[in-house]
């Protein structure tokens, strides 16, 4: 079995972290937790 290069391992780890953060952000923005978010423009009607 061949060993993988460190650059490939680091790039896969960074890609996984970015995809996880993106998924968490989409879930927070559009999923069930979005009901708790406030709209600052609605709070400050002029």
From Swiss-Prot:
KW Acyltransferase (keyword) present: no
InterPro entries cross-referenced by the UniProt entry: PSII_PsbN (IPR003398)
TM annotation in the entry: 10-30
Membrane topology listed for this record: Single-pass membrane protein
Any Gene Ontology CC annotation: plasma membrane-derived thylakoid membrane
Keyword terms, alphabetized: Membrane, Thylakoid, Transmembrane, Transmembrane helix
GO biological process: photosynthesis
Compartment(s) where it occurs, according to its Swiss-Prot or TrEMBL record: Cellular thylakoid membrane
Domain of life: Bacteria
Family, as annotated: Belongs to the PsbN family.
Function, as annotated: May play a role in photosystem I and II biogenesis.
Protein name: Protein PsbN
């Amino acid at each position: 079995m061949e060993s993988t290069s460190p650059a490939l391992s680091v790039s896969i780890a960074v890609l996984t972290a970015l995809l996880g953060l993106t998924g968490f952000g989409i879930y927070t923005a559009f999923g069930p937790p979005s009901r708790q978010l406030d709209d600052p423009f609605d709070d400050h009607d002029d």
